[in-house]
């Protein structure tokens, strides 16, 4: 049996409107991020910086009321910590690597990974060259996985993420 989970990466397609989440939930969407690589009405990105906005807080509240999971991939460090202050449910990073292994703003710090674990969430590492390291190969990908395993020895909060479109 195969299954899929519908996700929203960057809710620009519906004008970042929290009121539209219920409609999307009825359509089968269960995971939502707050943006992609640019600042938007909900939050700052890893490129632009900036925290969670009031509209972003409303978006998270509505998504979690519906039972949707928040994906923190692509957001700024400040927005990440703002989300951790307001979340009432597990948070995931569907495709974010370890910043300790590759110092890129898209990757998670050890403290961020620990916080995701505390919520009961999961971090899915990816194989996109820019986020893996200067010599991206299978060994370097494994370095991210092994680093997360040092922080979460049971591996309950680690997954293989997406972003395979960025793999060369």
Residue ranges of model-derived segments:
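Hydrophobic faces of well-ordered beta-strands that scaffold small-molecule active sites
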Residues: 4-8, 32-34, 70-72, 91-94, ...
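Active-site histidine-anchored catalytic micro-motif
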Residues: 31-41, 54, 63
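Acidic/histidine-rich helix-loop elements
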Residues: 15, 38-52, 99-106, 127-139, ...
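Histidine/acidic residue-rich metal-binding segments in metalloenzymes
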Residues: 16-26, 47-92, 105-121, 139-156
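Short acidic/histidine-rich active-site segments
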Residues: 127, 153-168
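Extended substrate/RNA-proximal surfaces in nucleic-acid metabolism proteins
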Residues: 2-4, 8-12, 16-38
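Short, small-residue-rich loop/turn micro-motifs
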Residues: 36-38, 87, 162-164
């Amino acid at each position: 049996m195969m299954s899929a989970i519908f996700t929203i990466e960057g809710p620009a397609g519906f004008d970042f409107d929290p009121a539209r989440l219920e409609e999307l939930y009825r359509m089968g969407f269960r995971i939502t991020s707050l943006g992609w690589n640019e600042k938007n009405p909900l939050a700052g990105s890893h490129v632009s910086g900036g925290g969670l906005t009031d509209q972003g807080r409303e978006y998270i509240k509505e998504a979690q009321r519906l039972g949707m999971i928040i994906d923190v991939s692509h957001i700024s460090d400040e927005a990440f910590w703002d989300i951790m202050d307001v979340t009432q449910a597990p948070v995931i990073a569907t495709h974010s690597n370890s910043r300790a292994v590759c110092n890129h703003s898209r990757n998670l710090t050890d403290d961020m990974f620990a916080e995701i674990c505390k919520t009961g969430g999961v971090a899915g590492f990816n194989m996109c060259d820019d986020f893996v390291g200067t010599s991206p190969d299978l060994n370097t990908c494994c370095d991210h996985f092994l680093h997360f395993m040092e922080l979460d020895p049971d591996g309950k909060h680690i997954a293989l993420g997406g972003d395979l479109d960025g793999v060369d």
